Each structure stands twice: as C-alpha cells, then as structure tokens.
Amino acid sequence: MKKEEKISAEEVKRVKGLGCLKDKRYEDIFNVRVLTRNGKITAQEARVIAEASDRFGSGSITMTTRLTQEIQGVPYDKLDDLFAFLAENGLKTGGTGAKVRPVVSCKGTTCQYGLLDTYDLSEKIHERFFEGYHDMKLPHKFKIAVGGCPNNCVKPDLNDIGIVGQRVFRRDLEKCRGCKKCQVEANCPIKVAHVQDGKLNWDGCNNCGRCAGKCPFHVTDDYVEGAKIYIGGRWGKRTAMGRPLSKIFTDMEEVMEVVDRAILLFRDEGNPGERFADTVARLGFEYVEKKLLGE
C-alpha cells in the first residue's frame, strides 16, 4: 500500500482490536502493543521486540501504563508481517477493547515492603482472566492491578479490581507495657499507632506490617498475611476511588474467585458503555459486595 493512503474507519477499528493504535499524524502508521506478563519479559523476548521495531517500525519502543511494550511507527502494510514475526517468537499483540485488559503488578515479590507474591498472583490472573476470558465481551474495559503493600505503587484502588497485600496482626495487648518510648509507635510510617491510657492504640492501621517484631514484649510478633480487594476504582477524565471489601483474604484462590465473580457480574449486569465503577454505583456497593463474596 502506498504511503499516506487513507485506511477505512472500519479497518482502523479492526486493527485497534489487535493492539494497533493509529498515529494521528499519518494516515497509515500505527503503534503496536506487544503483550507482556504484567510487565515481565525475558532477555530473548526483549531482543525479539527490539528486532521487530527495527524491521517493521521506526526503531522506537515505549511502555504503556499497563506495562505492554509499544512498537512505534509501523506502516499498515507491514502489520501482518509484524504479527507473523512476533508469533514465530512466542509473542502477540493486543491489550485494547471492551474486555479484561493486561494485568499490572508491582515488584512485591522481591520488594522489601512486599506482603504478597505479586508475580505469582498476577500471572495466575493474567492466565485465567486476560487470556482465558480474551473473547468475553464486556460493557467496557476492565482493569486489574496487584499491589504488594499499602504503598500502592501501582494504584490498585484506581482500577476496576485492585488487590493490595496486607499484614494483619493478632495483637496481644496483655503483653503491652505502655512504654513511654513505644517501638511500635516509633516504627509506624503513617503515625497512627500510639500509647493511650497505658496501652497501644492503632485505630486507622493500614496493615502495612512495618511494626512486625518491633515490640520487645512481642505484641506484634503474631500476624497473618493476606490481601485487601478494592472494587470500582477508575482513573481518567472521571476518577473514582475504589472501595475495599469488608474482609481480608488469606486464601489467594478465594481472591481469584472474587475477581471471577466481579468480571461475570460486570458482564451480566453492567450496561453497555459503562465502567465497573458506574455499575457498582448503580447497583449499590452492598449488593455488589454480597455477590462477590458469594453470599
């Protein structure tokens, strides 16, 4: 196809569904999203994407907010060759449309603050829902993020479903001596832990776990790690903060079931064109929570 030949709106829409976004400056140039596993690729995959960019695109690669790699400047008449080259090397394009979008996660598996194996959980979500529900048509896009701790580096509470690692203490206040220099208080990064009336008070604790093992009298030695799940978050032109479900999940398979129920509820009860945040607001948080908890 000749350069600058106009492409029909139907064809632009079709290739957008394959992860190819038209460069507004040209009639026949596209930026093509190559899928990753939640931002992770191997060194060999990186070499393949770099070669693909040189052979079929402009030689430039960008990262999207959902951690796909976007090959810049691919002419329309090279798209099929690019798809074939990537497929030969075990890669594919995508990440657009009214469906489950690429899952994002932080580095909680290796981060000093991580309370979840974010790599493992997000890869399971990727396989079961991004890949497994690839052909499921939803009312709108559906975004999932996995964060390892309340630092919220990947902003889970601004996604349709956000999962946040938690460390929940089984605090034994009988052991508390009401120390004038309380080590739990000293190590609380959000400054909510404090001694009140001779005992430790931690109303407002966000379960970051930074005080674990800090009390010399073992008040914070016993804990369980799990996850908080936020629903109905959204960023963009209309922002909505997600709300947390009322329980902490210690079984990751239960987390997977909640994600599954949320996607199916959105499919079945969402209105065409509305985001999950709007669905939750319209149906009511309490109703949606009961559905997601299987009650």
Predicted regions and their residues:
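Charge-rich, low-complexity segments
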Residues: 1-24, 284
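Small-residue-enriched alpha-helical segments and adjacent helix-cap loops
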Residues: 4-7, 32-179, 204
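Short glycine-/aliphatic-rich beta-strand segments at the starts of folded cytosolic domains
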Residues: 13-40, 104-108, 243-244
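Short beta-strand elements
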Residues: 19-22, 161-165, 227-235
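Short, flexible, solvent-exposed loop/turn segments with mixed acidic/basic and small polar residues
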Residues: 21-26, 57-63, 194
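Iron-sulfur cluster-binding cysteine motifs and their immediate structural context
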Residues: 181-200, 206, 210-226
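A hydrophobic, small-residue-rich beta->alpha segment in the mid-to-C-terminal subdomain
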Residues: 225-227, 233-270
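Bimodal "functional hotspot" detector
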Residues: 271-287, 291
